[in-house]
Amino acid sequence: MQLCRFYFPDEEPALSLPKEPRLGQVVGGSVVDLTASGQPAFATLSALLQASVTTPIEALLREVNLAALPAYAWRDLEREPAPGTPHLLPPVDRQEVWAAGVTYAWSREARVREARSKDVYVRVYDAERPELFFKSTAEKVVGPHDWIGLRGDSHWNVPEPELALVLNPAMHIVGTTIANDVSSRDIEGENPLYLPQAKIYRHACALGPVITLAEGLDPQHLAIRLTVRRAAAGQPEAVAFQGETSTAKMHRSLDELAGYLGRYNDFPDGAVLLTGTGIVPGDDFTLQDGDQVLIEIEGIGTLCNPVRQM
């Protein structure tokens, strides 16, 4: 089962469609408007995550008569929104977004290459306690087809494709989505204390397109693919970078990461936790203005974002 957040933009007033964010369930080629059911649990994502502490989301969905609710035509997730179709929002409303680092061996090696303080990354990879850091407020997260940004004070910016866990207030994994943990590698490499500046800024976190519920999906064995498309002046678009990994290569379990995030902390609206990247482009690669970044995760879908120089 897959859920999404969506809205209908203001440029289509003649359609008399609701303008506030909605929760939807993806069913075949349609998005069914769960918010239209009037049930409090489907009013917002926060309400749903809170309700899931006592009742599984799958059980809440079984109580809804989907046939009686408005349904809107879905679309190819790699295409721009078409008039009259739901425009996808990032799957967060009031959740804090956190991230884990150095959870794959390849990520550890890349951090060692870029860093002046190399032993920091070696030690955290093997340590009992994982690296966890704050990534974004919900307001700064971008969704499918929205742009991701390149810092003007950095010359080495990369996408980091990651599986993201959707957690309820009890820190239970209720679903997964796709994340792009955009990073300025030169800033982080200069000094580990610069990590917040390398990771936390406007348009540096993309999530979506949907939340795949945990039931029936093994998130510890999912293929992840990254493609960066680039069009040179006067030339057709071509692949500038492509890579693939699997969550099976992750050094830590997902429950372990979620458990550490919840230690001595409270998340009344739930949280989203990025689980680290196992795909790191070579040291000679950096994102450029106009690139298109596509991240595909098995069982979830494809997150597509254009790149813009800030």
How would you name each of these model-derived features?
Residues M1-P13, T54-R230:
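Active-site microenvironments in enzyme catalytic cores
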Residues S16, V53-L60, G262-F267:
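Short, solvent-exposed cationic patches
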Residues P18-E20, P159, Q220, D289:
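Residues that act as N-cap/strand-start positions at coil-to-secondary-structure junctions
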Residues Y7, R185-M310:
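Catalytic-pocket segment enriched in acidic/His residues
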Residues P40-Y72, Q235, A240:
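Active-site-proximal helix-loop elements at catalytic-domain edges
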Residues M1-T54:
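Gly/serine-rich nucleotide phosphate-binding loop at the start of the catalytic core
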Residues A36-A41, I178-S183, S246:
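Short, solvent-exposed aromatic-acidic interface loops
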